[in-house]
UniProtKB/Swiss-Prot annotation:
Residues annotated as the enzyme's active site: 67, 111
Catalytically driven reaction(s): a 1,2-diacyl-sn-glycero-3-phosphocholine + H2O = a 1-acyl-sn-glycero-3-phosphocholine + a fatty acid + H(+); 1-hexadecanoyl-2-(9Z-octadecenoyl)-sn-glycero-3-phosphocholine + H2O = 1-hexadecanoyl-sn-glycero-3-phosphocholine + (9Z)-octadecenoate + H(+); 1-hexadecanoyl-2-(5Z,8Z,11Z,14Z-eicosatetraenoyl)-sn-glycero-3-phosphocholine + H2O = 1-hexadecanoyl-sn-glycero-3-phosphocholine + (5Z,8Z,11Z,14Z)-eicosatetraenoate + H(+); 1-hexadecanoyl-2-(9Z,12Z-octadecadienoyl)-sn-glycero-3-phosphoethanolamine + H2O = 1-hexadecanoyl-sn-glycero-3-phosphoethanolamine + (9Z,12Z)-octadecadienoate + H(+)
Name of the molecule in the record: Phospholipase A2 group V
Annotated binding of Ca(2+), by residue: 47, 49, 51, 68
Signal sequence extent: 1-20
Organism of provenance: Rattus norvegicus
Transmembrane segment boundaries: none
Cofactor binding description: Binds 1 Ca(2+) ion per subunit.
């Protein structure tokens, strides 16, 4: 997940319009948690950002581990998790996925589970893990 958010940040800053779910994920994180997705979660712990290994550092990192596994299941179903875009609405604090085809709706569901988990675990967020080095995982 570390690389995923890093790539989202890069794409968001350098390309005006980008296909794929990375920008949707970034937007969803920011709407639900109120935190900057890249700065706060792009390099957090052992699992937030691209890839991940080791033991999650706290509740926030466990959310990212769960998200990595959700994406892994979608990859097994041949979903293009890095390029597949999807539509969602954010209404009254709820994320509503708006797709009827298999991969987009499931990708959105993975991201929705992540952001709800991150919101539930805002209390566990520890700045010591914000830019945690991978070699310590």
């Amino acid at each position: 997940m570390k690389r995923l958010l890093t790539l989202a940040w890069f794409l968001a800053c350098s390309v005006p319009a980008v296909p794929g779910g990375l920008l949707e994920l970034k937007s969803m994180i920011e709407k639900v948690t109120g935190k900057n997705a890249v700065k706060n979660y792009g390099f957090y712990g052992c699992y937030c950002g691209w890839g991940g290994h080791g033991t999650p550092k706290d509740g926030t990192d466990w959310c990212c581990r769960m998200h990595d596994r959700c994406y892994g299941l979608l990859e097994e179903k041949h979903c293009a998790i890095r390029t597949q875009s999807y539509d969602y609405r954010f209404t009254q604090d709820l994320v509503i996925c708006e797709h009827d085809s298999f991969c987009p709706v499931r990708l959105c569901a993975c991201d929705r589970k992540l952001v709800y988990c991150l919101r539930r675990n805002l209390w566990s967020y520890n700045r010591l893990y914000q830019y945690y080095p991978n070699f310590l995982c």
